[in-house]
Design a protein with these regions (language model features):
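Structured extracytoplasmic
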Residues: 21-213, 221-228, 299-316
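Surface loops and adjacent helix of pleckstrin homology
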Residues: 17, 44, 252
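Solvent-exposed, well-ordered amphipathic alpha-helical segments
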Residues: 2, 11-16, 130-133, 211-215
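Gly/Pro-enriched, hydrophobic low-complexity segments
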Residues: 188-194, 203, 212-315
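Bacterial Sec-dependent N-terminal signal peptides
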Residues: 1-29
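Alpha-helix boundary/interfacial micro-motifs
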Residues: 15, 19, 61, 262-263, ...
Length: 316
């Protein structure tokens, strides 16, 4: 149970211009968006419902990750683990060339480890780091990026396939319910009529990567509701970046925090994308998170993933 919930929240992905809620070292110093003003959208067929519908129906984020398999690119991966005082305890750095010019090859250009990272048996101390390594170190082999339509954990599938569907829903389609996720599956469904009463909605206008005009649509818990109600809402804020020219989603940030008698977590995640030719591809993924589970070592970690130098693999 612990691994199921931790795996899902570790991998639920996730924009600068948002301060991190956890007060400690932040590896992400890359600023990609400049906001200029609040926006009032007055068109009759364009407003909050337009943004919400785009968020809950979008599958282009998922497709963008799958499209990586056609490209050669360089990935720089940085992982940091922390002690109880939020001082850096361990560091991992990988610079990897994902070479898709011919049969796929993963080439390490740099590989550095420092601090407390491994158990005596050679495995990572933290499950967070283990999951990072499984999913992002080699995205070509990740089970999350299989072909086929998105689902929410349909009946009739094997345990592993249903589990992957849950992960995909939380990562790529926030706002949808996640069937079969213990304790928190219904708390992701923030756009129902009942849940909307607890959230405020705001729009901003800005420029992304110095040239792309964007809207920033933010959903955040209302300030005037009771502390007990706030504590029971898992998603504290959800921010989505839309390209004004075609309404494509280029970025997504989610802040989640929840506590009960079985587990306690505080997680902020971010995913950003940009265009390479006509293709939308991932360029930055960040994570800051604390996990506490009875009788287990508390997990504190952050990571920064940067993808660059994409080019279409030969013959793809």
């Amino acid at each position: 149970m612990r691994k199921l919930i931790l795996f899902i929240l570790t991998t639920a992905l996730t924009l600068p211009g948002f301060g991190q809620a956890i007060d400690r070292f932040n590896p992400d110093t890359i600023k990609t968006i400049e906001l200029d003003s609040n926006v009032k959208i007055t068109a009759r067929k364009f407003g909050i419902e337009t943004f919400i519908n785009a968020i809950v129906t979008d599958e282009t984020f998922y497709q963008a990750f799958r499209n990586m398999k056609k490209y050669t690119f360089t990935a720089e991966n940085r992982i940091y683990t922390y002690d109880k005082k939020n001082q850096v305890e361990g560091k991992i750095y990988r610079k990897i060339r994902h070479n898709n010019d011919g049969p796929y090859k993963m080439e390490y250009l740099a590989k550095e480890d420092a601090g407390k990272l491994f158990k005596k048996n050679g495995k990572y101390q933290l499950y967070t780091v283990e999951m990072f390594d499984y999913i992002f170190m080699n995205p070509y082999n990740s089970d999350l990026l299989t072909e086929g339509p998105m689902t929410t954990g349909a009946k009739g599938k094997g345990a592993n396939e249903g589990y992957k569907d849950k992960l995909k829903t939380l990562i790529f389609s926030p706002g949808r319910p996640i069937k079969g996720l213990p304790f928190i599956g219904d708390k992701t469904q923030i756009f129902t009529a009942n849940m909307r009463q607890y959230y405020d909605y705001s729009y901003d206008s800005g420029v992304y990567l110095d040239s792309i005009p964007v809207y920033r649509f933010k959903v955040a818990i209302k300030k005037d509701i009771s502390s007990g109600t706030k504590d029971d809402l898992m998603i504290k804020s959800l921010v989505t970046i839309f390209d004004k020219r075609n309404f494509a989603i280029l970025g997504r940030y989610v802040d989640m925090k929840y506590s009960n008698m079985l587990f306690d977590f505080d997680v902020q995640m971010n995913i950003e994308m940009t265009y390479f030719g006509e293709e939308k591809l991932p360029t930055k993924i960040t994570y800051q998170g604390n996990w506490d589970y009875p009788f287990k070592k508390e997990e504190r970690a952050s990571f920064l993933i940067v993808h660059k130098d994409y080019h279409l693999g030969k013959g793809k």
